[in-house]
Amino acid sequence: KNVVDAYIKGLKVAYENNHNLFIEMDAGLSHDPRAIPMFLRVLNEGNECAFGSRFINGGSLAESPLNRVFISKFGTLLSKILLGSKLSDMTSGFQGFHRSIVYKIINHKFRSTGHFYQTELRYLLKKYRFAEVPIHYKAPSPSVSVKSINNSISTLLWLFFQKVVGGYRGPFGVVSV
């Protein structure tokens, strides 16, 4: 139905095949697969989540149009302000998880129906052990649809409202400040 359903379906198939570590990345080589060993190392060092970041030392946005860079940086800034995130990149789609986290992901009904799913997920996982991994990203397209932007804004505001009224409750536990 939507991009989130595709992510969840892929994670569910991998989960049902009894994998213990999971890497999620964009198709089409917009994410550099040479970063995968760093994700695995971070996950094997006791972190439950590994989040790719284009904005930490060693990361980059290669050949990305200015509007994509702006959207990524602005989305991260807004998430930091409204949701209290400490991550340097809230909009990257390159991430890794332990099996226990994937169980929670596949049993959660995400509010987002688009790529803001990554931001929603990072907010929900903020109390778990995580580390950021520097990644290189090459944007495949300069365009971002109005529908995607509207979904992102409405989901961000909904998460902020949940935070203000006492926290989100679900398979990730209570998520608030």
Task: Enumerate the predicted regions with their spans.
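Acceptor/aglycone-binding surface of glycosyltransferases and processive sugar-polymer synthases
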Residues: K1-E16, P33-H115, P140-T155
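Active-site catalytic microenvironments for nucleophilic, acid-base chemistry
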Residues: V13, N17, L124-K127
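Short beta-strand-to-loop acidic/aromatic patch adjacent to the donor-nucleotide binding site
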Residues: H19-S30
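Residue-level detector of anion-binding/catalytic polar loops
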Residues: N20, E48, R129
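Short, intrinsically disordered, charge-balanced linker/junction segments flanking boundaries
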Residues: L21-F22, L40, G46, E120, ...
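Short beta-strand and adjacent tight-turn residues that come in two discontinuous sequence segments
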Residues: E24, G52, V133
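An aromatic- and histidine-rich active-site surface loop
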Residues: L29, M38, Q118-E120
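Hydrophobic helical membrane-anchoring modules
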Residues: G84, N107-V177
